[in-house]
């Protein structure tokens, strides 16, 4: 499957630049773009990535891995790849900070599927750093509160049947959009939370 480049409307007028691939041999280049061109150029307090996983139909395996920095999203379809990408494993185990929502399940899936763990302190659980009235605030609740009200309809606008198609190559357009937005929301939520916390620390 050839690598595909495109744009996804996140919300309002916010556009995401999206790379979608299942080619393991091309991943080192795209990961280098994330780490060196964008990540290393940012201020220290902005050095983190949004991370999200989509699961196989039986919920046991990782089907898709999404990484986001600012408006740049990389979608790697692990399920339809050759499942050999040591550069990605090294990237996940490096000292980069990742922000995600479903941290418990994602950690278990990475341990079971990849045999790796993101280092302690490098995986931020957004559900522990930001809570509404819910015991475990969902990504949708957080996105509505901090990013845009449009995210309140995300689950209802994405048919349940599509959740069983993350292993399909080529992914449907609606799945690509959903995956890109999930990764972006993970990034943008943590960015906004950090901005608020930074401002509060400097209020006198």
Residue ranges of predicted features:
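A short alpha->loop->secondary-structure connector
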Residues: 113-123
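Short alpha-helix plus adjacent loop in nuclease-associated cores
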Residues: 124-148
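Nucleic-acid-processing active sites and adjacent nucleic-acid-binding tracks
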Residues: 72-92, 96
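N-terminal accessory regions of nucleic-acid-interacting proteins
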Residues: 1-49, 81, 126, 195-204
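Short acidic, Gly/Ser-rich segments with clustered Asp/Glu that frequently serve as metal-coordination loops
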Residues: 48-60
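A short alpha/beta connector and helix-capping loop motif
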Residues: 58-73
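Acidic, Mg2+-coordinating catalytic module of metal-dependent nucleases/exonucleases
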Residues: 144-204
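Acidic beta-strand-to-loop metal/phosphate-binding motif
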Residues: 96-103
């Amino acid at each position: 499957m050839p690598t595909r480049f495109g744009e996804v409307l996140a919300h309002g007028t916010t556009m995401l630049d999206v790379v979608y691939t299942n080619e393991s041999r091309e991943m080192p280049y795209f990961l280098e773009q994330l780490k060196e061109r964008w990540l290393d150029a940012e201020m220290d307090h902005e050095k983190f990535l949004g991370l999200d996983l989509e699961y196989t139909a039986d919920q046991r395996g990782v089907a898709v891995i999404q990484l986001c920095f600012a408006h740049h999203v990389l979608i790697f379809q692990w399920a339809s790849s050759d499942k050999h990408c040591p550069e990605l494993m090294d990237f996940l185990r490096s000292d980069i900070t990742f922000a995600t929502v479903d941290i418990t399940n994602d950690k278990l899936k990475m341990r079971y599927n990849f045999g790796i763990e993101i280092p302690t302190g490098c995986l931020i659980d957004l559900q522990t750093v930001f809570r509404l009235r819910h015991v475990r605030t969902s990504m949708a609740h957080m996105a509505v509160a901090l990013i845009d009200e449009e995210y309140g309809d995300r689950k209802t606008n994405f048919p349940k049947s599509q959740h069983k198609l993350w292993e399909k190559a080529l992914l449907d357009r609606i799945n690509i959009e959903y995956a890109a937005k999930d990764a972006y929301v993970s990034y943008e939520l943590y960015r906004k939370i950090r901005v608020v916390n930074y401002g509060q620390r400097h209020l006198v």
